[in-house]
Amino acid sequence: MYGYNGEDPGGGQVLQPSLADAIRAFTSGTIGPEDFHAVFTSCKVFCPRGERPGFLALHDTPQPVIPMFSSLAELRHYSGEQSRFFTVTGAEVLDLLPGGYGIVLDIEGEHRVVFDAQAIEQMIDYTMRRMYG
């Protein structure tokens, strides 16, 4: 075999980039929307938690957005060490997000990315087409 020693150190698994890596790659143009979508929908997303169930929204923006984070460290940087949170997958975000809201990933991070409500609708449509044809 050329270039292989016959061993598979990765156990046959393809390593997927972290959400933080995908955000950096997406904002720098290294990956496109489809690749970002694939990572986002399968990764864990950290969300600030309030007193009542549901997403916490920022309404002091042109359109309401919901802050979400690629890691607990990013969330803690934004909302403090003792902040409460919950986690969902990106796919669950797309399923549960109320209409008319966008999201901002890693709002205080070096590579923050904002998806307005229209972009979220496009992500949902893309997901539905991939799932149901």
Q: What spans do the regions from the language model cover?
A:
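An interfacial alpha-helical scaffold signature
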Residues: 1-133
